[in-house]
A protein has these predicted regions:
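Basic, helix-initiating cap at the start of DNA-binding domains
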Residues: 1-32, 36-41, 45, 58-65, ...
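C-terminal peripheral helix-coil segments that are non-catalytic and often amphipathic
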Residues: 2, 139, 143-242
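Alpha-helical structural segments
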Residues: 16, 20-27, 62-82, 97-104, ...
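Amphipathic alpha-helical segments that line or abut small-molecule/effector binding pockets
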Residues: 23, 92-111, 135, 139-149, ...
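Short helix/strand-bridging catalytic loops that position acidic/His residues to coordinate divalent metals
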Residues: 117-130, 211-218
């Protein structure tokens, strides 16, 4: 079996310095926010010449893009790992695990979450290569939705919706990043839950639930658990008692 060639000393050094730059940038996200991110300031903090840092990232926007992709991939990996521990036939359990993993990741990584789901960074336009990483959770929710429909858990009229053509046109931008052949109403169904999920998580992280949901954490936990229960019924159908 042929393995990959070992990295050269130069490649290892580049990887280490790149990691240091990204760590420093995440520090700025925590203390100053994404709009204040500056390659010159990071270079100064790392004891590097600005010209040297530009050999790793050509611009602030390129660094932001890397941070955004890394954050989306970290979130997606966390959701996929949690969902992957649940029995494949337990659609409700897989859906609930995905939702819980999203919230847990967001609470553990508030600055990265704010970067990808908070206020847009002035002057920055995310390139197309951020879309696929951003779609990982959506794809996971869609997969569960499709399996629920195949198992007869989604009403037939919801799959063959009379409004399918307008829906298909409306969601055309995201469909190219999702598994092909899925009926538009099912994509719409998954997107509805996706926006609900991230809306609730964003409200919690950004303080909009203050004076709405009881503190301490137990109150927010109970509120989120009830949201999951209702979303699960929408996606996988009502729980069948044994």
């Amino acid at each position: 079996m042929t393995g990959s060639a070992p990295r050269t000393a130069r490649e290892r050094a580049r990887a280490e310095i790149t990691a240091e730059i990204l760590d420093a940038a995440r520090g700025y996200l925590a203390t100053d926010g994404a709009p204040a991110l500056s390659l010159r300031a990071i270079a100064r903090d790392l004891g590097m010449a600005s010209s040297a840092l530009y050999r790793y990232f050509k611009s602030r926007d390129e660094l932001l893009t890397r941070l955004i992709i890394d954050a989306y991939d970290s979130l997606g990996a966390a959701a996929e790992a949690c969902e992957g521990t649940i029995d494949r036939n337990d659609l409700a359990g897989r859906f609930a695990a995905t939702c819980s993993a999203v919230r847990d990741w967001a609470l553990a990584h508030p600055n990265e979450y704010a970067l990808i789901y908070g206020s847009p960074v002035p002057g920055y336009a995310a390139p197309a290569d951020t879309v696929r990483p951003a779609s990982r959770v959506t794809t996971l929710l869609l997969r569960i939705t499709v399996e629920a429909a195949a198992a007869g858990r989604v009403p037939e009229e919801d799959i063959k919706d009379a409004e399918a053509e307008p829906v298909a046109a409306a969601i055309a931008p995201i469909r190219s990043y999702l598994p092909p052949g899925v009926p538009a109403p099912l994509v719409q169904r998954a997107l509805m839950v996706w926006t609900n999920l991230f809306g609730v998580v964003s409200f919690e992280l950004f303080g909009q639930l203050h004076n709405v949901v009881a503190e301490p954490r137990a109150g927010r936990d109970a509120f989120f658990a009830e949201c999951i229960r209702r979303w699960t019924t929408f996606i996988t159908g009502p729980t069948v008692s044994s």
